[in-house]
């Protein structure tokens, strides 16, 4: 893969550096107004800190016409038809290159049930896009065909969440910050583990949804919409109990009485010794293969 879509479209200059170092050539993120200013999201941009990393900025309004407003009967554009939507896409400003749409799969049958016509809308949309003289393309195709219009610098992390487009939905209150802080505390020790199940559970614990469910922001519609918990406090208590159990499992493997640096040095020594043993075994096998086989035979006994 050459293009990265980060969770919740999270992006900033530090993330850009890490993503480019991983070998990606492009990234998808949010067309946040406070980042773009007077610029349109309908162009290819490049990172200000890594110019070779090209960016597509989500068109929030057109994306949320589908993800948030399609089923809203109080919306003045309701009902939204495929031909109407295609005409909106075609009415972009002159000279604009590309419109990047991004939404959760939940819009298909969950946020908008089949009875809303959402599936019929998407079945019909490609035909009306073609009639409007537009074409669809993958991010890699877009980056291969279009040159960046300008550079984008993002010092503070942006996302596609709510009006502020920040990380507030996941790290905005003391519950979320406490849970995340405890998770991060065990990063190095967990990385040292050779237990695949522990590393798998560690990845599960990093899911952004766990922290979204702890949101207490009244304006955060997604938290209450998706959360299986009765309250943010229930979500916090459940997560901390699971995290505590996880810590005990890691503790059994690598006791916290041993400092991370000391433990890392011990593991490195064991790894080096293992490599030395493997090399010696290979050398022994080679010597055995080169040693001439002992000749055997029978002689006739003299009479």
Q: Where do the language-model regions lie?
A:
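Acidic, His- and aromatic-enriched active-site or binding-groove loops in soluble protein domains
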Residues: 20-41, 46-54
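Active-site and substrate-binding clefts of carbohydrate-active enzymes
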Residues: 43-53, 57-58, 72-75, 87-295, ...
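Distinct, well-ordered alpha-helical segments
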Residues: 12-22
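Positively charged, amphipathic and often flexible ligand-engagement surfaces
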Residues: 29-38, 56-77
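Short, solvent-exposed turn/loop segments enriched in Gly/Ser/Thr/Pro and often Arg
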Residues: 4-11, 140-142
């Amino acid at each position: 893969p050459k293009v990265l879509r980060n969770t919740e479209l999270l992006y900033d200059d530090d993330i850009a550096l890490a993503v480019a170092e991983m070998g990606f050539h492009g990234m998808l993120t949010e067309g946040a107004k406070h980042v773009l200013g007077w610029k349109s999201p309908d162009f290819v941009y490049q990172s200000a800190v890594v110019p070779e990393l090209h960016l597509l900025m989500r068109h929030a309004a057109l994306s949320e016409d589908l993800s948030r407003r399609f089923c809203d009967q109080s919306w003045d554009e309701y009902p939204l038809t495929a031909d109407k939507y295609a005409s909106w896409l075609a009415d972009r400003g002159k000279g604009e290159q590309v419109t990047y749409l991004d939404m959760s799969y939940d819009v298909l049958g969950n946020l908008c049930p089949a009875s809303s016509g959402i599936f019929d809308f998407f079945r019909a949309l490609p035909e009306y896009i073609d009639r409007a003289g537009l074409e669809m393309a993958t991010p890699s195709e877009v980056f291969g065909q279009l040159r960046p219009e300008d550079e984008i610098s993002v010092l503070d992390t942006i996302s596609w969440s709510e009006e502020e487009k920040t990380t507030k939905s996941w790290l905005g209150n003391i519950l979320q910050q406490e849970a995340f802080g405890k998770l991060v505390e065990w990063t190095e020790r967990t990385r040292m583990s050779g237990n695949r199940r522990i590393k798998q559970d560690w990845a599960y614990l990093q899911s952004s949804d766990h922290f979204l469910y702890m949101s207490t922001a009244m304006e955060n519609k997604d938290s209450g919409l998706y959360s299986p918990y009765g309250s943010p406090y229930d979500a916090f208590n459940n997560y901390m109990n699971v995290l505590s159990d996880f810590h005990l499992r890691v503790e059994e493997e690598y006791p916290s009485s041993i400092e991370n640096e000391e433990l890392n040095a011990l593991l490195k020594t064991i790894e080096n010794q293992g490599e030395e043993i493997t090399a010696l075994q290979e050398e022994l096998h080679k010597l055995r293969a080169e040693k001439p086989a002992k000749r055997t035979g029978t002689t006739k006994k003299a009479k």
